[in-house]
Amino acid sequence: MERKHSMKHCRLAHSLLLSLFLLATGIADLAAADSAARKPVLLYSRYYNAVGETRYLPDGTYKDILTRLRGEFDVRVHSEPLNEQTLAGVNVLLIANPSDKAVGTNLPPPHVTAADIGALTRYVEQGGGLIALGNQENHNLEIEAMNKLLLRFGLQFTNLYTDVKKLVLPRETPVIGGLLWGYYTGNLVLTTPGHPAKPRPLVLNDLAQKPLNGTRDTPGALLAVAEPGRGHVAVVTDAGWISNDALSEKGIGGVAIKGQDNWEIFRRLAHWAAGTAASANSSKTE
């Protein structure tokens, strides 16, 4: 009798353990599936862009790039101040052509403040990604205040320019090697030697590849990166290269760069900045 009772308890215990194991396995599978289904968050912030500024609007000249990104990112757009609350859950932050002056009779745009620098530095060092896009002259570009932020990562914009170029990137270039960059004119990035964020050029201006239009061809970095703390920063010296007309190869300013891989370059940069692995690409690869 006692033996039968003991065997019954053993069977019950075994069934209970099996049920718990299956439950735990199911929960783990669901969690893994949910994690895989969640896309990294890309925030296109318009906070530093002046009210009334028509360049690079999310439903304008940046509509196509943001539409494509939605296939791999949870793309969000807003003009709210950048702080701990608005950056919560954001994997990569995009800032394009921050405005210097007011547009028309609108209020002047916000410039980077000490509080912003603190919040954004913490965000990046704790694992966030930042992509900042500069530009050429006459684009209402603000760099003085923005550089105070970028210098935290050993990077800074300059007022030295290079005209439109069709750049074949060396195959050994990390992340974007072997691709063709349609570069539509911009400034240069300086890097600070020995900085703890490990700033370095990713794309140096290849003087052997001549401008398609214009004569400015300044040696230096057209795209530079840094890795402060657990985060990733990419600073690019042109904002028009991911606009609708650049991606469609209609061209900008009367110059059309054919065969460019601008979407694939930005896609890879966005994944690198977000700390995620890029899936199979949709255009040319190495």
Task: Show which residues each predicted segment covers.
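Short intrinsically disordered, low-complexity coil segments enriched in acidic
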Residues: 1-2, 104
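Bacterial N-terminal signal peptides that target proteins for export
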Residues: 2-17
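Bacterial N-terminal signal peptides
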Residues: 15-29
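Short, surface-exposed patches at the edges or C-terminal ends of soluble domains, predominantly
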Residues: 32-286
